[in-house]
Curated annotation (Swiss-Prot):
Residues 1-10 form a propeptide. It holds the Pfam family Ribosomal_L27. Keywords: Ribonucleoprotein, Ribosomal protein. The keyword Cell membrane does not apply. It comes from Phytoplasma mali (strain AT). Belongs to the bacterial ribosomal protein bL27 family. The N-terminus is cleaved by ribosomal processing cysteine protease Prp. The keyword Chaperone does not apply. Transmembrane segments: none annotated. InterPro entries: Ribosomal_bL27, Ribosomal_bL27_CS. This is Large ribosomal subunit protein bL27. SUPFAM superfamilies: Ribosomal L27 protein-like (SSF110324).
Amino acid sequence: MLLKLNIQLFASKKGVGSTRNGRDSHSKRLGAKISDGQYATAGSIIYRQRGTKIHPGYNVGVGSDYTLFTKINGFIKYTNKKNKKQVSVYENIKKI
């Protein structure tokens, strides 16, 4: 009499499905670097931004990536105009 042999082979490792999570981008570190009323030296970065969220005022330059920087040594002053925010640099804060 012949015996039928029933052999089942199981996986030694469980098949694991991939996940769609697990990635994240580095923070861009945008925003104000110098606050209102603080003293800044020439060339200091005042505000990092995407687009002109804040516009340049007196003695403030704009970089190619819309970064605002000081042109002179002085005090930072943020102001609100009708439809836009603006930042300026003054040598003496009492003149404002």
